[in-house]
Regions:
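The feature marks the mature, well-folded catalytic cores of soluble enzymes
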Residues: 1-199
């Protein structure tokens, strides 16, 4: 991968690079009961979503460099300092600080996948045993809408202030990539919406 400089100065100009996320197990980890919590009316058909996404990706690859969100996250997690900061933000957001040590010890590719698919909740207390939730850090079935949480204007990035908690983790993951990935460079952030989400 060569270094990519963020530089968007037109809404209609040639597309040089795009970030995508292929739908995966996070779709299968939704249940009819949890679908409304992650802003869906119904369960998606994963095979259909994958097929349609692959068609779109095939078209995009003809005209632009295509970067996969999960791959960029895995590469970003190689920065141990960033990995600790990101995990601290996520466990704080979801109130599962007891998982921080385990997540920090997880291999980067596995952790990147897990952050999209969801981190299962340990049913190690009566409260958790009785909880209808299956995940301590929920799956991110909206992650393939990468344009929702981040925008670029010229050489700087805007990290969205997501209206729903179900989308906050996406913004945190994208912020980490644009701040710490050693081959994606920008001139910083115009706005970091994750700062207001964590308050």
């Amino acid at each position: 991968m060569r270094e990519t400089q963020v530089n968007i100065d037109s809404e209609i100009g040639a597309l040089n690079a795009v970030m995508i996320h292929r739908p995966g197990r996070e779709i299968e980890n939704m249940t009819p009961a949890s679908a409304p919590d992650v802003l869906y009316d119904d369960i998606l058909n994963l095979q259909l979503a994958e097929r349609e996404h692959d068609q779109l990706t095939g078209v995009l690859r003809r005209v632009a460099a295509v970067y996969e969100f999960e791959d960029l996250l895995r590469e970003t997690l190689a920065d141990e300092r960033m990995k600790v900061l990101l995990i601290d933000e996520l466990v704080s957001l979801y109130g599962c600080e007891e998982l921080a040590e385990e997540l920090n010890g997880t291999e980067n590719a596995e952790l990147a996948a897990q952050l999209f698919q969801g981190t299962p909740m340990r049913k190690d207390s009566l409260e958790k045993f009785l909880s209808p939730l299956r995940h301590a850090i929920p799956p991110l079935p909206n992650a393939f809408f990468t344009r929702d949480a981040v925008m670029a204007v010229n050489e700087r990035v805007i990290i969205g202030s997501m209206a729903f908690k179900a989308r906050h983790a996406e913004a945190l993951l994208l912020k980490s990539i644009f701040k710490y990935h050693n081959e994606i460079s920008s001139d910083g952030f115009y706005y970091d919406g994750t700062a207001s989400a964590s308050q």
